[in-house]
């Protein structure tokens, strides 16, 4: 179940403040994110797909939705990524994504299966968006954020890019991510 937790990013000390909102209501999640320029949707699921599905199977199953998003957003490159709990680079990848960063393009993800925690640092707030199966999220270019896939990741996601290079991050150097709960904590 998708969920949204909102914190005030300005707090005394190193501990995260108490959340000002915590909800699993998809309509509230979408409305709160929309107020901050973040798009959130839920697409129909394809029950035949799971974390073990190949990139080709995933892209074929969602070809109509992918074409719509590409046409609307001008996305040149689309791929599907799957990461399981036995992936040899899971710890290294997790650490890379846990550092606050921005992108020069929108970060658009659709969770085919599994889950991941997007943490968005917008002004004086940190929004933690737990995305799960059938959640689609679009984070605008320049938004400070980090992502946690957990210690034992298990997800498949479709990624949309406006450039041929794929995922390119500009790290902020801000250690704020260390003050907030991780996926599974």
Swiss-Prot record:
The record marks 100 as: May play a role in metal incorporation in vivo. It catalyses: 1,2-dihydroxy-5-(methylsulfanyl)pent-1-en-3-one + O2 = 3-(methylsulfanyl)propanoate + CO + formate + 2 H(+); 1,2-dihydroxy-5-(methylsulfanyl)pent-1-en-3-one + O2 = 4-methylsulfanyl-2-oxobutanoate + formate + 2 H(+). Keywords: Amino-acid biosynthesis, Dioxygenase, Iron, Metal-binding, Methionine biosynthesis, Nickel, Oxidoreductase. Its EC number is 1.13.11.54, 1.13.11.53. Signal peptide: none annotated. The keyword Iron applies. One of its GO terms (biological process) is L-methionine salvage from methylthioadenosine. Catalyzes 2 different reactions between oxygen and the acireductone 1,2-dihydroxy-3-keto-5-methylthiopentene (DHK-MTPene) depending upon the metal bound in the active site. Fe-containing acireductone dioxygenase (Fe-ARD) produces formate and 2-keto-4-methylthiobutyrate (KMTB), the alpha-ketoacid precursor of methionine in the methionine recycle pathway. Ni-containing acireductone dioxygenase (Ni-ARD) produces methylthiopropionate, carbon monoxide and formate, and does not lie on the methionine recycle pathway. PANTHER family: ACIREDUCTONE DIOXYGENASE. Belongs to the acireductone dioxygenase (ARD) family. This is Acireductone dioxygenase. It comes from Synechococcus sp. (strain RCC307). The gene is mtnD.
């Amino acid at each position: 179940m998708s969920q949204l937790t909102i914190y005030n990013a300005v707090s005394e000390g190193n501990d995260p403040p108490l959340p000002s909102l915590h909800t699993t209501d998809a309509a509230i999640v979408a409305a709160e994110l929309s107020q901050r320029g973040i798009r959130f949707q839920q697409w129909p699921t394809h029950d035949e797909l799971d974390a073990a599905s190949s990139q080709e199977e995933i892209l074929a199953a969602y070809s109509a939705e992918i074409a719509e998003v590409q046409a609307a957003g001008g996305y040149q490159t689309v791929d599907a990524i799957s990461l399981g709990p036995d992936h040899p680079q899971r710890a290294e990848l997790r650490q890379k994504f846990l550092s606050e960063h921005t992108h020069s393009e929108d970060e658009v993800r659709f969770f085919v299966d599994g889950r991941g925690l997007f943490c968005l640092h917008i002004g004086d707030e940190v929004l933690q968006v737990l995305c799960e199966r059938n959640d689609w999220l679009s984070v605008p270019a320049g938004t400070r954020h980090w992502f946690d896939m957990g210690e034992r990741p298990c997800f498949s996601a479709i990624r949309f890019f406006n450039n041929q290079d794929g995922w390119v991050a500009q790290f902020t150097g801000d250690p704020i991510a260390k003050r907030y709960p991780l996926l599974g904590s």
